[in-house]
């Protein structure tokens, strides 16, 4: 029987800030770069999901490292959204605006590090009575962020889904809701494709 390489069928990746949780909480700007070097040196991985870095110089060094390592890069917005207690589907316009601005900053950071993908997520589920309204607001948020990203170049986006009723209590928890959003946004933005 011929052996088949997994690499022929998928990119094997690692979530950087989960493998190295100190990245999220460290005050040292070099922690991100130092820990990414460990991943880049491990030829098992062909992709890495990274989160935010406040230091633009570190982001540019990260980009250089990831380019020479030939790793596919996905930028995760969940540390920003969850850590900042932001809500992209907030019914309050000021609260939603804070989330939109943060997501636009995430897009800028994703371009800085050379990411091919950005992973977006919804905020808290407001409950049955306001869920449809919150979904509409979330789609508006996504359109605004995707339009913003188009100005900078080509970036692909995916939707990170969490649970609706156990821990994260996210608006977009069930897969069917994520698929509905992807179907609606895919023709114009290639979202989720």
In which residue ranges do the predicted regions lie?
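Short beta-strand segments at enzyme active-site cores
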Residues: 49-50, 75-76, 115-122, 154-160
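Short acidic/His/Gly/Ser-rich catalytic and metal-binding motifs that mark active-site loops
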Residues: 82-86, 120, 127
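Surface-exposed cleft-lining segments at the edges of enzyme active sites
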Residues: 90-94, 123-136, 162-170
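An active-site-proximal structural segment forming one wall of the substrate-binding cleft
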Residues: 92-116, 131-152
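Charged helix-capping and loop-helix junction motifs
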Residues: 30, 134-140, 172-178
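Alpha-helical elements of Rossmann-like donor-binding domains used by nucleotide-donor carbohydrate transfer enzymes
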Residues: 34, 61, 105, 137, ...
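N-terminal pre-domain/capping segments
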Residues: 1-112, 185-189
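Acidic/histidine-rich catalytic cores of soluble enzymes
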Residues: 48, 148-193
């Amino acid at each position: 029987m011929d052996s088949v390489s997994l690499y022929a069928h998928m990119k094997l990746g690692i979530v950087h800030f989960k493998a190295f949780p100190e990245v999220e909480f460290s005050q040292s700007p070099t922690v991100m770069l130092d820990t990414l070097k460990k991943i880049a040196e491990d030829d098992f991985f062909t992709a890495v999901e990274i989160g935010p870095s406040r230091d633009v110089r570190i982001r540019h060094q990260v980009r250089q490292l990831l380019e020479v390592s030939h790793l596919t890069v996905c930028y995760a917005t969940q540390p920003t959204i969850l850590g900042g207690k932001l809500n992209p589907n907030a019914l309050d316009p000021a609260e939603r605006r804070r989330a939109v601005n943060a997501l636009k900053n995430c897009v800028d950071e994703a371009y800085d590090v050379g990411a091919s993908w950005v992973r977006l997520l919804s905020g808290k589920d407001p409950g049955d009575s306001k869920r449809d309204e919150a979904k509409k607001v979330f789609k508006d948020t996504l359109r605004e962020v995707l339009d913003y990203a188009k100005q900078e170049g080509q970036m692909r986006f995916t939707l990170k889904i969490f649970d609706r009723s156990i821990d994260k209590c996210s608006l977009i928890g069930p897969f069917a809701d994520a698929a509905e959003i992807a179907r609606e946004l895919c023709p114009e933005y290639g979202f989720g494709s």
